[in-house]
């Protein structure tokens, strides 16, 4: 049995640079990952099976996981389109060799939250099965498979700190300044990425330019062009940010991705934990964590 982390994804800034002829938005964004996330456990099995547990196991829709349990050998195939099992199917179709697996997904990341939960889960699956495989895929093949599963899956597969460009197909590693602790919070209201990107209130700030010399707060200050649209769709995001910004020891706060999760950076973990407690009292989901550093 092996267990792997699927870390939550944070967009420290996100700027919309325009749309291409296909209607895809081109972005400039800096992405990091946290020590908090979902967890996938793998055990050998005669047939593939998926069990979903955790706080948000029942909140998943057809875009990710739609049943608490999925087994290919049963007539209940409502989970056939979930991203974890699609990643496993895609791995085999690409030539990877892996025997049957019983997979347990502990779903800790809120759904529809702008934290990349489904993409992180798919990327964690690909990393794990490639390590277990008798005939692992080359990194380029694995990347192409990740890209076929969704725009955020390649960066979740790469991990670390990455500056992304275009529709997510351009990736450049970036050395993240010291950040201290990070607080994540969510109003417990799912927000559709499609609804945000098609809303008339998104901004088009363009490429941020050089990031040299910017500290963590300076990077966050480059902004999130999706925030105005998300605030219209889920006004509770504003209250979340206001509570964060009023807490002791905060360096900066912003919305992550397409929302509705927000994050804040703190020097001290104790301050982040105190802020999380305040948000929970106000009815928000919240957790204090650290930026995940790649060895």
Model-predicted regions and their roles:
Residues 104-133, 151, 250-266:
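Glycine/serine-rich anion-binding loops at beta->alpha junctions
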Residues 1-111, 131, 135-140, 177, ...:
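ATP-binding N-lobe of GHMP and related small-molecule kinases
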Residues 78-85, 123, 238, 273:
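Short, well-ordered alpha-helical segments
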Residues 2-6, 13-29, 132-252, 265-295:
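ATP-dependent small-molecule kinase catalytic core of the GHMP/sugar-kinase superfamily
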